[in-house]
Amino acid sequence: MQTYLVGGAVRDKLLGLGVKDRDWVVVGATPEDMIQRGFKQVGADFPVFLHPDTGEEYALARTERKQGRGYHGFSVYSAPDVSLEDDLRRRDLTINAMAETENGDLVDPFNGHADLEQKKLRHVSEAFAEDPLRILRTARFAARLQPLGFSICRETMALMRQMVTSGELGDLVPERVWQEVQRALHEQAPGVFFDVLRELGALQVLIPELTDEQPFRQGLSALQCIHRKQGSTAQHYAALLSGVPEPDAVARAKAMKSPNDCRELTHLVGLFMAQLNGASPETRLTPELAMELLDKADFWRRPDRFGVLLGTLACTLQSEPDHLIQQLELAAHRAQSVTPHPFLQKGIQGKALGEAIRKERVARITEALHLPE
């Protein structure tokens, strides 16, 4: 029974990056051997165990064979006779197919270290083509490592184009696609992820709304702005789709099974963009429009979300965003200062109360924006 550190931990250690998670492969053992040593089995599809002290994952060496289309179209073989090299061969990229012995010696049967030095992302074998999710993973690694000078080698780009042409990208379940997109949004250079997918023709399959040049470039520009501000996942995603018409953007967010906060913010950004982009700075925000937007954003019950929305709009609006954001903030602040109490004291109730509050809010917004009533 031999234990090896594998994958990302070895890669990041060689790159001089901080190692966050450590994964291990065990060769020459059975599930019973692991359980006898106090490990807890957690893997449903293949034998993965948690270390009794560290909680780190230890997987028995395994091979995978393609048997059908889609994520579940693989048969897994795990037994004591599976070698370390067999296990590493099933991995996606050579830089992820290295291992380290318990003595710290590097095991590198597929020249991953050389590719690290040459800053190349290269597939381990033709078996790469068996899993279409690897297209997204490779694009995501490009987004992570491009600032360090890495690029995808030509042979791997060619193989991925063939995979896109085969149509298997359409077999990926939305949850798996979203998982990769969500991770990519927070990589070092998230725009690279979408650039790679577009070059491969994969974006046409996964997010066809971004195929055209204008929404794609606008989305990437807004995405880079949000990324510099270290925005949330919802802000990143809404920024990415900010050049897409609101109904189409929301439909894509739903189809991709993104979380509710992503869908809601995508919807609001689309609404505000449609109302505020294009018109002159003097005419595009009237008190009535400000009230309408505050209502649509549910500002009265969710003021914190409105702040998130404004932070996103600061990156998505095409002209004079700072001035417009300041106006919206001021309008919201002044409108929020109106309370029912003075009207209730005057005996105003029911529908008349709501109308009186709204009228006063519009008046205060008008005053705040220095507009004639």
From Swiss-Prot:
Keywords: ATP-binding, Magnesium, Metal-binding, Nucleotide-binding, Nucleotidyltransferase, RNA repair, RNA-binding, Transferase, tRNA processing. It catalyses: a tRNA precursor + 2 CTP + ATP = a tRNA with a 3' CCA end + 3 diphosphate; a tRNA with a 3' CCA end + 2 CTP + ATP = a tRNA with a 3' CCACCA end + 3 diphosphate. ATP binds at G8, R11, R91, R137, R140. It holds the Pfam family PolyA_pol_RNAbd. Mg(2+) binds at D21, D23. GO terms for molecular function: ATP binding; CCA tRNA nucleotidyltransferase activity; magnesium ion binding; tRNA binding. CDD domains: NT_ClassII-CCAase. GO terms for biological process: RNA repair; tRNA 3'-terminal CCA addition. Its EC number is 2.7.7.72. CTP binds at G8, R11, R91, R137, R140. Belongs to the tRNA nucleotidyltransferase/poly(A) polymerase family. Bacterial CCA-adding enzyme type 2 subfamily. Catalyzes the addition and repair of the essential 3'-terminal CCA sequence in tRNAs without using a nucleic acid template. Adds these three nucleotides in the order of C, C, and A to the tRNA nucleotide-73, using CTP and ATP as substrates and producing inorganic pyrophosphate. tRNA 3'-terminal CCA addition is required both for tRNA processing and repair. Also involved in tRNA surveillance by mediating tandem CCA addition to generate a CCACCA at the 3' terminus of unstable tRNAs. While stable tRNAs receive only 3'-terminal CCA, unstable tRNAs are marked with CCACCA and rapidly degraded. This is CCA-adding enzyme. The gene is cca.
